[in-house]
Every structure is written in C-alpha cells, then in structure tokens.
Amino acid sequence: MDQEYTPLDLSTLDLSAPLPTYPKDFRSGFASLVGRPNAGKSTLTNAMVGQKVAITSNRPQTTRHTIRGIVHKDEYQLILVDTPGIHRPRTLLGERLNDLVAGTLSQVDVLGFCIPANEKIGPGDRYIASQLVASSNKPVVAIVTKADTVNSDELREQLLAVEALGEEIMSAERAQREKRAAHRAQKKGGKGGKNASTPFAKGSGPAAQRRAGEISEPMPVDGKGGWAAIIPVSAIQHFQVEAVADLLSQYVPLSPPLYPEGELTDEPEATLIAELVREAALEGAREELPHSIAVTVEEMEFREGRPADNPLLDVHVNLYVERESQKYIIIGKGGSNLRKIGTKAREQIEAMLGTRVYLNIHVKVAKEWQSDPRALNRLGF
C-alpha cells in the first residue's frame, strides 16, 4: 500500500548555522564492560559517565539489560555498554542474559574485563576469559576494580594474578586461533596470511568488518599476559577512572561523535524509571528475593490542570514477584516497606527528571516468571 509522506519544509532549516568541527584524530566508538556478577561494572560505568545511568547494588546480577552510558571528551566520545554479569544460568532468564552479553561482544570495538581486586580469580573468571578470546577478535583490557578495598601489596598480587590469567587463557587461545587460521590459509592454497584490518585503522572498525562480512585476526597485545592492557581502578574513590576511559578510547576507531554533546545515555526514560524502582526494592531485600523482582512502567503522563511552573508527573509501575509470600515481604507490615521503596525511588526519579513525581507502585505476582518464556517476553526480556 502506498504511504503518504509530508514534504520537508526547507524554509524552517537554519542552513547558516556552522557545523561542529572535530580534530582529525577524534575517536568515537563502543566499549563493553563484562565480567562476573557484582564485579563493579555498573559503578564504574556511572563514574566514567559522571552521572547515574545504571543502577547498582551489592546483589549479584543486578544489571539485566545492556545500558549505554556516553563519555564526552575533547579527544573522543566513548559509548560504554554495561552488560549483565556472565554466570552459570539456572533459569531461562539467566540464559537470555548470557545470550545478551554474547551478542554484545561482536558489536563493540573494545572489551573491558572487570575483575574485583578483593576476590581471588576463580573458574568463573577463567570461563569468561576463554569466552572473550574465543568469540571475539576485539582487544581486551583487564580492569581490576574495587582497588580501594585492598592494600597496595594485595593489589599488586591481584595484578600479577590477572597477568597470569591472561597467559593461561588469553595467550594460549590466541595461539590456537593463529594455528587454525594458518591451517585454513594453507588449505586455500596460501591465499590467506595477509594482515587483516583492525579497529586501530581508520575505516576498519567492527561496523566496516560486519558490512564486509569479514572476521579479522586476533588483536595485538602489549605483552601483559595476552591483555591489551591491565589497569586498576576504584570507582568509589575515583582513582584512575579517567585513565580507564582514556585507555579504552585508544581502541575505538577514528570517527566523529555518534551522539550529541551532553547526551549521557540513550536509555528511554521509562526504562530508567523502572530500574530506579527495582534498585530501591533491592535495598535490604532478603537473599532469595532480589532475583524474583521485575518492574515495568505501565503509564507515565503529566497531570492535567497543573500550573505550568509546577507540573506533576504521574508514574504508575507494576512490581512483579514470583510468590505471594514475596509480595507481602515487599509490601511490609501496613505497607511500611512499600512506602520506603516508593520514597527512595521517587526521590531518585525526581532528581533524574527535574520535576515533581507522583509514583504509584502496584505489587503483582507472576509465578516463576524467570523460567516462563511468555512472562519474560511481557517483561521485556
């Protein structure tokens, strides 16, 4: 069926306004922070952006979708993709979150593998490292987070352990990939073996490679255990936060900015509001409860009849749990806990939007929603 189009009125365009100019060596691209649950990815994202764009909690698996935070500098624009923690899934939700991370790896320019300074490297870290190098040709920067939680000797030991992890997993896997590539080249009659393009070269970043359908060779490293680099950071004390952003920016392609100046995230307001309500509900929640909480925004509109200089935004959300017993925990005696959740969330929403908010939270039960495909689809997973 033919569609009707409204012609563009060129008279409304200000063609005299000068276009913004950027240095020839300006860089712009995507960096994904990956790691185990509760590795400090969201806290670091917020610190680099300079504003809260991702909710944080000491509960593992707080992040449930990829969140983009945008870092603006004179020399570069870095779009940070904060991902859910990679873990051994126990539910369909867990499987979908891992799939979400896997899909992200091929769409960014550089990976930041977050490893807490205060936790020994374990099987989960080895698994993630092997997945990163096996499924992506992108440079991987090892970021040792939570440096403020250990002393200098303990931090030095963790940095050495991270370097050893790179030697054990990253370098070994890269060597195997190079062997396989050489074998494929021989089978093709020696036609391969040319230097593949990398995100370091202009016009040869991930987007260009995807258009060409190419898979480039493993990225060069600086000798630190197979990592592109290793750097410690404390997002809480803002120790080396800018240094991490500067380091990651070195691996994104030459490009003008991809987002307007001043834009700190491309997340819809409804998504941010739902996340702030969930964050408030996670505080003080019992051990089994955090994973059972999901939040959706059902309605959001300014109340009619309010004065223009004193608007009020009505926000209605549904907070889902999996069992009736959990519903009563969320509500609390006489609704006391729900009021605390609402007050905490409303204050954060008002600070984010810059307007007064009336927040209505309706608690519902969606039985075993984490393993129900239809429920997951309704909740946006």
Segments predicted by a language model, with ranges:
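Conserved GTPase G-domain signal focused on the G5
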Residues: 40-41, 149-150, 154-158, 234-252, ...
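Conserved C-terminal guanine-recognition region of P-loop GTPase G domains, centered on the G4
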Residues: 72-77, 96-228, 302-309
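P-loop NTP-binding site
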Residues: 266-381
